[in-house]
Amino acid sequence: MGVCQSFVLTDEMKDQIKVNKEIEKQLEKKKNMQLEQTVLLLGPGESGKSTVMKQMRAMTGNYTKTELHERKVLIIQNLCQFSEMLLEYVREYILEMTEDDDKRYTVMCEELKMAVIHDGIMRPELADTLKEFWGNSAIQDAYSKRDTFHLTDSAKYFFDNIDRIKLPGFEPTNQDIVHIRVPTTGVAQVEVIMNNIKLMICDCGGQRSERRKWYHFFDEADAVLFVAAISEFDQKLAEDEETNRMHESIRLFWTVFNGKFFKKAAVILFLNKIDLFEEKVKHVKIKDYFPKFEGANTVSEGTKFFRRQFREGIHPDFKKRMYTHETCAISDQVQIIINTVIDTVIQDNLKDTGMI
C-alpha cells in the first residue's frame, strides 16, 4: 500500500511564487498598456478639428436616443445663432430689408431660443418663417460675405434642410451631426477601437485662450493629428482681426513641432476643407495673401505650396514621420482616410517600440 506524502512549501518557495505572480501581473498590465495609444487632435479654432473628432466618434457605432435628441437641440441652437449673425450683418451694413421683415425675423430668433429651451420642438409656422428668412435677398447678400463675419460653413446646410429638421420625428443623421458647430473648450475625449488597439482621442480647444491647456497632454501622445483649414488662406482670425488664419496655422504647427515636445510621436497633418479651397481658388489669388507663392492658382499647385509651408519650419526629426492629407471633414469619406492613416501610424509606433 502506497504512502501519500504531503508536499510542504518552504517559506522560500512561497516567496518565489509570490514574486512570480507579481511578475505575471506586471507583464499582463504592460501587455494591456501596449494596446493603448493616445492621439491628440490639435489645430486652430474653426479648422474642422472637432468635425474630425465627430467622424471618429461615428466610427465607433450608433448614437443613443438621448445623444440624438441632444444634437437635435444643438441644431436648433445653431439655426438661431446663424440667423442672428446674418440679421446683425444686414443691420450693420444697412442692406435692403423692410422694417416689417426686420421685426418678424427678430421675433423668429426669439422663438428659436424658446424652441431650444423646449427640447427642440419647432412649430410649422416657425419653420416656414425660417425658410422665408433664408430666401430673403438681403440675407443672401449677407451670406455671400460670410467670410468677413466668421459665419460657419454649416449655415447653408441647415437652412437647406429645414423641411426635414421641422418634422416631429426628426433624428439627426451623421451628416447633420458633423455640421453642428459648438466651440471646443477644454479637452473632449472619445475612445476608438481600431484593429484591437484602443485609441484615446483627445480634442483640445483651438482658440488662443485654450491652447495653454495643450501642454498637459504632450507627454502622453503617441500621435498628433493637426488640422488646418486650407480654404482659409484669405481669412482673418475670429479672435484677432489682424491675423491671417493660414499664417496662424502654420506658425502654430511650427511651434508645436519645434523639437521640444513629442519626441517619439508621429505627425499627421490634415489640410482640411479642400472642397471649399477648390471653389475659392477659382476667384481668389493665393499670391495676394502669400507673396512667396509662384505657381498657377490651382488646387494642385496650392496644396503643394501649403504642404511645403507647413513642413519647412518644423524640426528635422518630425519630417521623417510626417503624414499629410487633403481632407473634407464633413464628408463620410474622411473616415476611410482617418482609419488608414491612424492605423498605419499606430502600427508603426507599436513596431518601433517592439510592442507587436
From Swiss-Prot:
UniProt region (G5 motif), positions on chain: 327-331
SUPFAM superfamilies with a match to the protein in the record: P-loop containing nucleoside triphosphate hydrolases, Transducin (alpha subunit), insertion domain
Stretch list, region G4 motif: 268-275
CDD domains according to UniProt: G-alpha
Positions of region (G1 motif): 38-51
GO cellular component: cytoplasm; heterotrimeric G-protein complex
Lipid attachment, kind N-myristoyl glycine: 2
Residue sites binding Mg(2+) per the record: 50, 184
Residues annotated as binding GTP: 43-50, 178-184, 203-207, 272-275, 329
Domain G-alpha stretches: 35-356
Region entry G2 motif, spans: 176-184
Signal peptide: none
Region (G3 motif): 199-208
Ligase as UniProt keyword: no
Keyword field: GTP-binding, Lipoprotein, Magnesium, Metal-binding, Myristate, Nucleotide-binding, Palmitate, Transducer
Xref: InterPro entries: Gprotein_alpha_su, GproteinA_insert, P-loop_NTPase
GO biological process: adenylate cyclase-modulating G protein-coupled receptor signaling pathway; short-term memory
Quaternary structure note: G proteins are composed of 3 units; alpha, beta and gamma. The alpha chain contains the guanine nucleotide binding site.
Family: Belongs to the G-alpha family.
Function summary: Guanine nucleotide-binding proteins (G proteins) are involved as modulators or transducers in various transmembrane signaling systems.
Protein name: Guanine nucleotide-binding protein alpha-10 subunit
